């Protein structure tokens, strides 16, 4: 009987040790998985930010000083201010600093106080043309290759001489010989303002432009 009790006590110690080891292993695995996920998210964020930085100031064939706004270009809802204004393409890359209240560039109010904001303006590196590059017989003066203009985007119509910034919902600048932008291509306009959003866990966020049902608006992503 005594031997049985001793064996049971020893078994309890062994089982308790095994359970403790299992709990410790589980905790270690959970922590490792969390850090791995954080590392993966960090690498993805750096990849996106690096790509946007490489394209800062790229507006197709045109240089920023040669780009003008179309007369029908609508204002952006909740636009940023100063050099950070969405359609101020000449200031295509700069760094601002949030104040002590977490406010910056007129459109950010939730940044980590005294943190940096990186503003990047460019076009998507994918030209849209009237098909002439692929088929000399398809020269209609209408952007249709590889797709038509979307009514919920903003574009830069550009050639090597000049460019026009316009809403996709409006009539596009003419691209025929003698037109607004002769032999021009359309490029989707992009705006990013990267910053660290304040909170229990600060996170990398960005302001972009997106169609809100009535026009282009600055939103948080």
Stretches found by the model and what they are:
Residues 45-221:
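N-terminal pilin/flagellin-like segments and related low-complexity appendage regions
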Residues 1-2, 6-56:
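Aliphatic-rich helix starts adjacent to a transmembrane/signal segment
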């Amino acid at each position: 009987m005594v031997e049985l009790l001793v064996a049971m006590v020893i078994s309890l110690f062994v089982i308790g040790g095994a359970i403790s080891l299992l709990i410790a292993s589980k905790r270690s695995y959970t922590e490792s998985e969390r850090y791995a996920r954080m590392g993966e998210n960090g690498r993805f964020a750096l990849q996106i930010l690096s790509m946007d930085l490489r394209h800062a100031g790229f507006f197709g064939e045109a240089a920023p000083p040669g780009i003008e706004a179309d007369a029908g270009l609508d204002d952006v809802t909740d636009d940023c201010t100063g050099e950070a204004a969405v359609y101020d393409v000449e200031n295509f890359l700069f760094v601002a600093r949030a104040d002590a209240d977490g406010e910056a560039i007129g459109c950010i109010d939730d940044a980590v106080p005294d943190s940096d904001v990186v503003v990047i303006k460019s076009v998507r590196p994918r030209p849209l043309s009237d098909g002439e590059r692929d088929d000399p017989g398809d020269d209609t003066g209408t952007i249709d290759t590889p797709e038509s203009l979307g009514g919920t985007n903003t574009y830069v119509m550009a050639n090597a001489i000049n460019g026009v910034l316009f809403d996709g919902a409006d009539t596009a600048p003419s691209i025929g010989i003698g037109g607004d932008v002769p032999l021009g291509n359309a490029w989707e306009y992009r705006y990013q303002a990267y910053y660290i959003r304040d909170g229990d866990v600060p996170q990398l966020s960005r302001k972009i432009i997106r169609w809100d049902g009535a026009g282009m608006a600055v939103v948080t992503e």
